[in-house]
Amino acid sequence: MTTYTRKVSAMRAAVHDTFGGPEVLRIEDRPIPTPSPREVLVRVVAASVNSADSRIRGRRFPRGFGGVAPLMFGVRLPRIPVLGGSFSGVVEAVGADVTGVAPGNVVAGTTGMAMGAHAEFVAVRADRVVSVPEGVSHDDAAGVIFGGLTALWFLRDRAEVQLGRSVLVVGASGAVGTMAVQLARLAGASVTGVCSAANADLVRSLGAERVIDHRAVDVTTLPDRFDVVLDAVGVLDRHTGRRLLTPDGVLLLAVASLADTVLARGNVKAGSGPERASDLAHLLDLVAKGEVRVVLDDVLPLDRIAEAHARVDSGRKVGSLIVRP
């Protein structure tokens, strides 16, 4: 483990200055960011490590995005040295133009493309954070964000899931999948989950009426037809997914190739949704009321960031994975 002497006015952060495996990550001192007039400075208590962090670090993107993504994340060297897009913590300071948020407030939020949450402090726009309800832990608040926002946008906004609909969730034990199963169930849908046999009981406990072992059954050959199919892991494309739909069904591709993203039309929905503070507040309220459960694979100190990335890379992560600075 790397050791170093702490600098005044510095923070610990997980940094990568080259692309590669989890081993490229290290902990180093970085300047504590100064919030702009419309930003807040948050002392991070918990941050999630998810597939977005893994893809950027390893420069591994869905098919077709290899020529586009480097323009955002760096061609030869990383453009974003500190990853992490979802966090929970305590407001340390606010910019001159910020109202409604004060030092000491417990908040959760997103960073957008700027990332930076895998550190002791992060500066973000004030409209990107919301209050964490009493009784919701920092780990749960950070853990609900990535999967919850994705699942909510696809199921509620893109497919309009409602009572009596049949929903298939592929990748039902991951961060997106565990939230999708629960949100679909809350909407009154009948849920079928696809995951490994080891996670079948978990997925059932979240509300799936039926669970399919992806190692035993090729999901693309299922004889069943569903009103909504949400692929959270990139198993399906617009052709194989459509075969699983009822005549008026909707296919949701959370991990889509460039071609599927560009050519998504009609009953095929792909792409990434907005990170709306109102949606995050809604999800946190559901957690506070006990209506959804945040599944946590592990909670690790920031010093073990490489281990966290390796777990994400393995494809065996269950729910969300949290690091604490």
Feature locations, PLM:
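A structural motif shared across PLP-dependent enzymes of the aminotransferase-like
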Residues: 113-126
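Mid-domain Rossmann-like dinucleotide-binding core that forms the NAD(H)/NADP(H) cofactor-binding site
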Residues: 102-103, 142-213
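Glycine-rich phosphate-binding loop and adjacent beta-alpha segment
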Residues: 232-292, 324-325
